[in-house]
Amino acid sequence: MLGKPEDGEDQKLFDGLEYDYILWLDNDVIFSPSDFDKLYKEDKDVMSGLYLMSDNTHFAAVELWDEEYFQSNGSFEFLHKKDIGTRLLPFKVEYVGFGFLLVKKGVFEQISYPWFEPTYLEIKDCKDFSMEDVTLCLKLSKLNIPIHVHPEVVVGHYKQIEMRI
């Protein structure tokens, strides 16, 4: 995926080879070809399916990057199962995990390298170390590139839980 290190911030995705889309797929996501087809047919620059996090209640997506909520709760308000129950059409979010994410050619070409890097967030009195998916979502926001999620694409997320006394 990386370009040539000697190109510094001007690195090209796949060394400049042609591509149409890139799909991020976590190794613990369970999906069907029709899930992919739904994302692809929307023809958006950045389109994601939804998957539940380990609490089995919230999705790895944040509709509103609400720093007041973060300061009060120590995290952002992740989409809840009830939040998508009546939605039929794709909608914008400000953050999404990269477990099942389709990105169209042209998006990475607008972002300076490094595309992914850990971020140290400072939101008022709160400080948080965030991973590369947060960084990329913030970069997309600064470039006014919207992130969409498809409420009808809810893929499986295999999690194994170890319980101890």
Segments from the language model and where they lie:
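Conserved catalytic core of nucleotide-sugar-dependent glycosyltransferases
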Residues: S32-Y120
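C-terminal catalytic/acceptor-binding lobe
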Residues: K105-G106, Q110-I165
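Short, conserved alpha-helix that lines the donor NDP-sugar binding/gating region
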Residues: M1-D15, C137-L138
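Surface-exposed, flexible loop/turn segments at secondary-structure boundaries
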Residues: I30, S54-D55, V155, M163
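Short beta-strand-to-loop acidic/aromatic patch adjacent to the donor-nucleotide binding site
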Residues: G8-I30
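Active-site-proximal beta-strand/loop segments in catalytic clefts of secreted hydrolases
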Residues: L25-N27, L50-L52, E152-V153
